[in-house]
Structure formats: C-alpha cells, structure tokens
C-alpha cells in the first residue's frame, strides 16, 4: 500500500516538473515573439531625437545578468518590467504626434504578456512574496519611477518621449536576454 502511494507521489512530482518546464518553454517562445512585435511597433513611433535630453535612468544591474537568477525570478522580473512599460505608455503622449493605433497595439501586446505571466506565476505565491521585497524589485520600481518622473519633469514633450522610447527599446532587449534564462 505504501509503495503504491510512493509511486503515485513520484509520478506527480515527475509530471509537475515536466509541466513546469513545458510552461517555461512555451513562455519563452511567446515572450520572444511578443517582444519582437513590441520592438517593431516602437520602431513605427517616429520623432526627432535631441541629444541634450538624454539621461541615464540607471536600470538595476541584476536584470543585466540574468544567468544568476532563478527561472521564476526571471519571470517575475519580466512581469514587473512589462507592467511598468505599460504604465509609461499610458501616460500623456499626445505631444509626440504618434499614431494612437500603434500605441494601442503596443499596450494590447504588453497587456497580453502581463496576463500570461500572471497565469503562469499564479502558482508561485511563496516565491512572489520573496520577490516583491527583493532589492531587484525595488530597484526596478525605482528605475521606472525615474522614467515616469523624467517625462513629467519634461512636461511629456516629444523629445523626452523619444528618449523614453529608446530606453524602452533597450528594456525589450534586456527582456529578450532575460527570456533566454528559461532555456537553462
């Protein structure tokens, strides 16, 4: 009788590990496709760049070196980044002359990916509690606060938006790098 339960538990553990790895592979594929779509949409948002507006928002170094992060922490980092990029682009971009349809498409893509991550990470509540209070999370939130503050200080003018657009494009490249962490 005990052997039957042991075998049953072993099958469950094997199945759950396989299911998690499949989820990460699916997540990696969907994230990379989505991020490339977002990059394509960002390229369509034209404007003039004024080099005097450039600034260093100081993205946390931890996200620059994803090989040191666990898969679930990587997924949490991507989720925080996507949520904050979404919030940035919900700001007042009317001074840019950007096509609202393109911005809406970008927001839709970001929202879908955030929702997908939410579903996948729903089972990781204990890790979420650790992640929420981590220095990486706090660093990311401070980073995006600086981006939002920069736009506000520059009164959401088109030059500031072009700087932020370039920074978000860089964020998407970082997310692609983080996404490769799911292969390990």
UniProtKB/Swiss-Prot annotation:
Glycosylation sites: 50, 92, 99, 171
Family affiliation: Belongs to the alpha/beta interferon family.
Taxonomy of the source species: Eukaryota, Metazoa, Chordata, Craniata, Vertebrata
Entry's Gene Ontology cellular component terms: extracellular space
Subcellular locations according to the entry: Secreted
Modification after translation: This beta interferon does not have a disulfide bond.
Gene3D superfamilies reported in the protein's UniProt record: 1.20.1250.10
Chain's role: Type I interferon cytokine that plays a key role in the innate immune response to infection, developing tumors and other inflammatory stimuli. Signals via binding to high-affinity (IFNAR2) and low-affinity (IFNAR1) heterodimeric receptor, activating the canonical Jak-STAT signaling pathway resulting in transcriptional activation or repression of interferon-regulated genes that encode the effectors of the interferon response, such as antiviral proteins, regulators of cell proliferation and differentiation, and immunoregulatory proteins.
GO BP of this protein: adaptive immune response; B cell activation involved in immune response; B cell proliferation; cell surface receptor signaling pathway via JAK-STAT; cell surface receptor signaling pathway via STAT; cellular response to dexamethasone stimulus; cellular response to dsDNA; cellular response to dsRNA
Protein name per the record: Interferon beta
Alphabetic keyword roster: Antiviral defense, Cytokine, Disulfide bond, Glycoprotein, Phosphoprotein, Secreted, Signal
Residues the record lists as Phosphotyrosine modifications: 24
SUBUNIT field: Monomer.
Gene Ontology terms, MF aspect: chloramphenicol O-acetyltransferase activity; cytokine activity; cytokine receptor binding; type I interferon receptor binding
InterPro entries linked to this entry: 4_helix_cytokine-like_core, Interferon_alpha/beta/delta
Signal peptide interval: 1-21
